[in-house]
A protein has these predicted regions:
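Catalytic active-site module of serine/aspartate enzymes centered on a nucleophile-bearing elbow/loop
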Residues: 244-279
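Conserved hydrolase catalytic core segment
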Residues: 91-130
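Active-site loop/oxyanion-hole signature of alpha/beta-hydrolase fold enzymes
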Residues: 59-95
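Flexible "cap/lid" loop of the alpha/beta hydrolase fold
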Residues: 117-149
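Conserved alpha/beta-hydrolase catalytic His-Asp/Glu region
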Residues: 152-196
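Short beta-strand/loop motif that positions the catalytic acidic residue
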Residues: 214, 220-222
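Conserved HGGG/HGGXW glycine-rich cap/lid loop of the alpha/beta-hydrolase fold
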Residues: 7-65
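Acidic catalytic loop of the alpha/beta-hydrolase fold
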Residues: 225-229
Length: 279
């Protein structure tokens, strides 16, 4: 796969549908790899007429791991801009989930000339609106078992975490969850990167005053049953961005199961269509 460069930081990315006239840049969440935007989902975007680009955030997947280095969300936003530059894209529709939603908010603030539309999914605009249930918070705070010492315990831990924060209306099978945990470990395993990414989230502080100044077609998508970033996060995001549309989805938690593909796609494509109408 190609790599973009932001100074010394290398960002792994993958592009689908390079012949399409407009691009959707997909940014994923805390500690998660680009594969959380499945190829099947990207193919659906291509079928709707868009080029789809997904990436590994710094400290995740096959991108640079920054041992002993600190950074902020603005740096991660600049990584995404480096990907657009490497892919030859001047402006894009941007969509992000969870921490990725925070990154696309930061992109819209810092790089408005690069943004055609914004879709913020299961995210929040400030630390005060980033709330979790105790069980979901444990997903972040309880370290996984050492996979080299007890592989089955590691897999069981990952599967249990996925069920804790997942969508109750769109459950995964045990076989699907096991396959995901195993595939993600085989691709890359970097727990310290999650710690640094969490610090970047908190360091970015309150984006609401800056979001108030945006002028970009925006759709905010959030699960009514999200335990990790509770609904106040989506509600506050939509309230912060002028003209934003809020879509609260029953049965949706904090993941992207196949049963939600159409809902995610419609949110992204609605924001993109509004950008075209305003052009």
């Amino acid at each position: 796969m190609p790599r973009a460069h932001n100074g010394a930081v290398e960002i792994e990315y993958q592009s689908f549908g390079d012949d399409r006239p407009e691009t959707v840049l997909l940014i994923n969440g805390l500690g998660s790899q680009m594969t959380r935007w499945p190829e099947a989902f990207c193919a659906r975007l291509v079928a709707k007429g868009y080029r789809a680009i997904r990436l590994d955030n710094r400290d995740t997947g096959l991108s640079s791991w920054l041992d002993g280095q600190s950074y902020v969300l603005a740096d991660m936003a600049n990584d995404a801009m480096a990907v657009l530059d490497a892919a030859g894209v001047k402006r894009a529709h941007i969509a992000g989930v969870s921490m990725g939603g925070m990154i696309v908010q930061r992109i819209a603030i810092d790089h408005p000339d690069r943004v055609l539309s914004l879709t913020s999914i299961m995210s929040a605009p400030s630390p005060d609106t980033l709330t979790s249930t105790p069980d979901a918070m444990a997903v972040l705070n309880v370290a996984p078992p050492d996979p080299k010492s007890d592989w089955e315990a590691y897999v069981a831990h990952g599967m249990a975490n996925a069920r804790t924060i997942g969508s109750p209306g769109y459950p995964w099978t045990d076989a699907e969850l096991r396959a995901r945990v195993e595939a993600e470990y085989a691709r890359a395993f970097n727990p310290p990167g999650v710690v640094r990414q969490r610090k970047a989230i908190m360091a970015d502080g309150d984006r609401i005053p800056e979001l108030n100044k945006l002028d970009v077609p925006t759709v905010v998508l959030h699960g009514e049953d999200d335990p990790l970033v509770q609904p106040i996060g989506g509600q506050a995001t939509a309230a912060a961005v002028p003209g934003a549309e809020l879509r609260m989805i029953p049965g949706m938690g904090h993941d992207l199961p196949p049963g939600l593909y159409d809902i995610f796609l419609d949110a992204i494509c609605t924001a993109a269509s509004r950008a075209k109408a305003n052009a």
